[in-house]
């Protein structure tokens, strides 16, 4: 048996996955024969066989190119969609297999808890000496907050998400070993129905989504998935604590959610004060509607009659107060429910929620009032033999109210520093504002930021737009409460003047509380390598500024800093980005501690490794000691949201993993490693020389022309994927002006994945040449940061394909001979040292399940990529005007994304 096929060996626990993949693959074949033709299915089989043979012999893709070249756009699109449909069912099968494995762990009992879950985390903590008292003291400090962001390369439509959930549900039902043959046939029919409907649904919308569309998309995950699983998360934690320690303390809220959709103005002219207000209103309606529906369901359960059981005096008193508060609603109560106090109170609680929606008399002033009502019901049920008569359902609703409040998710607002600077310069009439250094600007801004002098108002678009934003935030704080608002993030923050500028603008916009303070958490986002290096100085200057320190005192002496993984990688390469982020956290923590401020980090991670993606548990294990301290705030983007939160069971697993990782990192951080003092200079050298190689490549003359020819970036820019443009508005096509997401997406499509590894080999070679090979091996063995870094690079390399990348590169004409040899040589150097330092014969040798997943997909991605190159060449020959070819190319982009499970 050849090497390729012999490597596709499923471990015993994964044999059910193999069976599912085979069964669903056959179902895809039936679908293609029915929806297109038997001849089309035969053609797909011929292409598939050729692709597998190429992989087995490690041959160049020329045989595939000959077979696929010159197809009519409609035929090409159908072929691509056929392979994409295979990826769709394989991805679903793998997700359902994760559910299967989770159930197997749960059935086996707590002697073998699932790795990285809550049971596993608590058992490890107890083994390290953490007592129940210590755990109880830490729990109120735990704050885990995934923040959902709009993603300009998200390639999954809402209509397809819903059908995917139907397919998942049918497979999950089929896991039940008690299903009858008829029931299994029904499951298969449901799957086939959803799959066929998906085939008949276009992969992409013909129009660019609006901010409202993006908000609805994120709202789907919040209201349809996470709303359902939040109570289960807390129940799982209680069970894990009881199993580990024997008793359970009262649990505080540990989880909440944030969003950027509707508030991220950076480079997006479609986001403004109106979308901020509209988003907050829409989220309020969505979550209050869920509460009303759940209370309605609860009412039918809480039908206890006072002729049979008692209720608490506190509940009776509350019922009387509500009758007086809402006489019209009380009058509508049905007489036959007169002996059912829980149901009567429930009716009036729903009436109060409706009044809250309508801003009418009798509205709840805050979520805490609804929590109080639910707690009254719980206490009364517990005191009157009702633990098994509705208490469980009422408690689940209470956990939801604690988690989602009346706002569903906290809304962040983000804008670039230069936008604020231009507005202030215009307001002050200072044409040389940019020429002044940060100290000079801070001195000018001080009186305005402190509220001593009003910042002048001027009648121009930039100032009016910002005034409207801060006025909207002030109104939102009054209407929705402080909990509805997250942070104000300054992208491309460079110095303290950038922060003081926002403080001054907020005051002018009316965002001031009764005490005269600005009730806003202002968060600088350090994105470039240089800004990460200078971030410590910026924060030190900021915390030493008396005006800002007074503002911070009103915010609890807690400062948040956001770390940008995307632009730092685009700027200096992945090695410099990762090391710069690591060093920045250490230095920022030390600076904040010296000045008596608690510093928390907001991690701006993306889906790909090049943008900070990867497992949260491993990332936190590799993070600097003390950098978590009970809190995790991290962006969740695009396909990451889909992958982690698209299915309820996997969403629950994701929340458990994050919470468990935060508990482990906070309660028992790694002991200080004295060898790090010796390792850091070596990593400095790796990062420095890696950056030199990376910048020499991307900074070479005509590189941007090469990039635009050797990747499908021009197709991506034409796709209707998000409301935000791929380049910063009004700027040219230079690399610095291209956003990180399409940069990574384009290289991922071309299968070169440059942002995820380029320069690493040169950096490692430089360290070896300097005599540090044994130190590097020691670092790979014993330093979680470095080991995780190498593992991530190995994963990226495994998803790339040099042969396919060469096909794309040849589209650049003469530039191919200049740039592709650099890619080939750096790839060989990087791959060689990564394998050597990880002591592996092949990439991902330590993770056979991931390796199998990638190898399973590659032969099916290859035909799409080869076809993409052919179509791209033909489309460009029409100056990008052939819409049929463009549609086929868009199908290719979606297909490759499904296959590699990665966009930007």
UniProtKB/Swiss-Prot annotation:
Names of the cofactor(s): Mg(2+)
Function (record text): Forms oxaloacetate, a four-carbon dicarboxylic acid source for the tricarboxylic acid cycle.
Active site as annotated: 151, 570
Name the UniProt record assigns to this protein: Phosphoenolpyruvate carboxylase
Catalytic reactions of this protein: oxaloacetate + phosphate = phosphoenolpyruvate + hydrogencarbonate
Top-level taxon of the source organism: Bacteria
UniProt-recorded Gene Ontology molecular function terms: magnesium ion binding; phosphoenolpyruvate carboxylase activity
Family of the protein in this entry: Belongs to the PEPCase type 1 family.
EC number(s) on file: 4.1.1.31
Broad enzyme group: lyase
GO BP terms, alphabetized: carbon fixation; oxaloacetate metabolic process; tricarboxylic acid cycle
Pfam families: PEPcase
